[in-house]
Amino acid sequence: MKKFVSKVLAGALGLSMLCGVAAAEGETYVSWYTFGDVYLSSVRTALDAAMEAKGRTVVDKDSNANQQTQTDDINTALVTGANAVVVNLVESGAIGTAETLMNAIKEKDVPAVFFNRAVSTDNNEAAELFKGYEKSAFVGTDFTQAGIMQGKMIGEYVLEHFDEIDLNHDGKISYVMFKGDEANQEAIARTKYGVECADEVLTAAGKPALEFYDASNANKYLVDLNGTWSNTASFDYMQTILAQYNEANGNMVELVICNNDDMALGAINALSNAGYNLAGGEGCTVIPVFGVDATDAAKELIANKQMTGSIKQDAEGMADAVATITANLIAGKDKFEGL
């Protein structure tokens, strides 16, 4: 089976910047939703390097996927004199939380740059938030595009390998979808479009739409209940699935779709434990597994024929935009200078 990575640069994803310029010299505080996210780890490494290149001292703080922790840490940073606050919001899409943080930062008259995780489910509402403070900005991607591209990739792959993937020869492809977080806007979009866009490709070619493996699951996905997009969640789910849905029972899950590569890794580990998707792909059945982020671990799995495909987001592009806008706001320059 052909394995591939589709690359999506931040610009191609529609890098969006919503902006509302300077503070005293000091430390720039960057509050991360979690240090445990593999993609965000690559953004953090790139952002630290980009800020250092601009002569800025950065303090990175892990919120451990806890909004109260993030709020408390940001308030502490403001009291201790941060010259700017950069926020990777824990509660994605929670406008009330974003407003609370924005007001606290605005009160200290220092720049506020939110990035990556949406501040609202409504673009107009988000725009109004940033219009309300001239020293603020949002840097992010069009959160629908990774899911759309993943879905198209899946549809094209399944169409090309339909008979090979259809293990029980029932003329349908059964799948499982692993969702990273119930409320996160990117997770919602990837869960929706990862299947819908695949179905569009398949049905246009006269093939049936994908079929969720468990007809009793109305949501048609399994979510990480901790909201951390983790390989632990997908591993546990996949282990449980394989005990009931397998080739011996004639109902094997034939396709695995994941919101990110870390969840894909967990699913692959469970499959490997059951004798599927072994390194090299020889002498075993390989269940197609798709993710998002094109992490180093995912690229290695693809090279080893254990994983099928991933969508790459541009961590460096995201980091450069955040660093440039933050440094410009601190220096009192036009926030877009250098972009």
What are these regions (language model features)?
Residues 2-4, 24-339:
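A residue-level marker of the well-folded mature domains of exported/periplasmic proteins
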Residues 4-24:
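Sec-dependent N-terminal signal peptides of Gram-positive bacterial secreted proteins and lipoproteins
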